[in-house]
Regions:
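Single conserved hydrophobic/aromatic residue that forms the stacking wall/gate
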Residues: 1-9
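A common structural junction motif
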Residues: 23-24, 115-123
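Active-site palm subdomain of RNA-directed nucleic acid polymerases
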Residues: 28, 61-101, 105-117
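Reverse-transcriptase-like RNA-dependent polymerase core
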Residues: 29-45
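A conserved non-catalytic segment of reverse transcriptases
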Residues: 37, 125-197
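Short, solvent-exposed helix-loop connector elements
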Residues: 47-55, 171-173, 189-203, 214-226, ...
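A terminal-accessory region detector
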Residues: 224-260
Length: 260
């Protein structure tokens, strides 16, 4: 989801109306209105928030979740689902979401109505990320008739694709998306440039911290290849970093592996 292009709809009023549907205390509603109008500080300059909740506001994440709940989740559950022919599911994280359908006709119908729904509340879909794909247990069979392959999609940094388990059963597998992987590798390269003058103990401590965080998020089943590739990239970057700190080469690859 991306922001709307115009100020046709006052989203602050919709936010208040959504909250009023669950909270009747006028004192709380008054505080919500004051928070929405409080404004934010940007580079030591005050910016008023006449529209939305304001980027950087302490209440912005909560307000955004409430807004998305009523605009999308509640609408999908209470209005859309009863009108569909088959099964449908919705997974939402912040302003990213994936919707699954049993029938293509339901997906096409929902996609058209979703655009109108978002526009009515001052939002719009990110066209580059929004698409209909053939995916699931029977996707390969259906795609083979047209000579195509099942689609893939990226969600929360993972590329999801159709595959099979060791027993030959259908299974959705996930791997680190190429975009996220390349971005993280670039960040490592830039970090190495800043750490050239650091002590080896400090460098390894920092890299271990990064690797631990990376493993905790991306360390899932079927993602071993990308995890191993990222670890190798970090090691290679460290190897080059240590050998560039002086005119004389500090380590060869074997010595480097023994050292770490």
């Amino acid at each position: 989801v991306s922001r709307g292009l115009g100020d046709v709809y006052k989203r602050q009023e919709w936010i208040v109306r959504f909250i009023e549907s669950r909270i009747k205390d006028p004192n709380i509603i008054r505080l919500v209105r004051r928070m929405l109008k409080a404004g934010i500080m940007n580079n030591y300059e005050f910016e008023a928030t006449e529209e939305g909740s304001g980027q950087g506001s302490v209440c912005s994440p909560i307000i955004s979740c409430i807004y998305m709940h009523y605009v999308l989740i509640w609408w999908f559950k209470e209005v859309v689902t009863p009108m569909l022919k088959g099964y449908a599911g919705l997974v939402v994280y912040a302003d990213d979401f994936v919707v699954t359908f049993q029938y293509k006709s339901d997906a096409v119908w929902f996609y058209e109505h979703l655009k109108h729904r978002m526009g009515h509340f001052g939002l719009s879909l990110e066209e580059e990320k929004s698409r209909l794909i053939e995916f699931g247990r029977y996707a390969k069979e259906r795609c083979s008739k047209s000579g195509t392959k099942p689609g893939t999609f990226t969600f929360l940094g993972f590329t999801h694709y159709c595959s099979k388990s060791k027993n030959g059963r259908f299974r959705v597998k996930r791997k680190t998306s190429k975009k996220k992987f390349a971005k993280k590798c670039r960040e490592i390269n830039q970090l190495m440039g800043h750490m050239k003058t650091w002590k080896l103990k400090e460098i390894t401590a920092k890299l271990n911290q990064i690797l631990t965080g990376y493993y905790h998020y991306y360390g899932i089943t079927d993602n071993t290849e990308r995890i191993t590739a990222f670890r190798y990239h970090v090691m290679k970057s460290l190897f080059y970093c240590l050998n560039r700190r002086s005119q004389k080469k500090s380590y060869n690859w074997v010595e480097f592996l023994n050292m770490i």
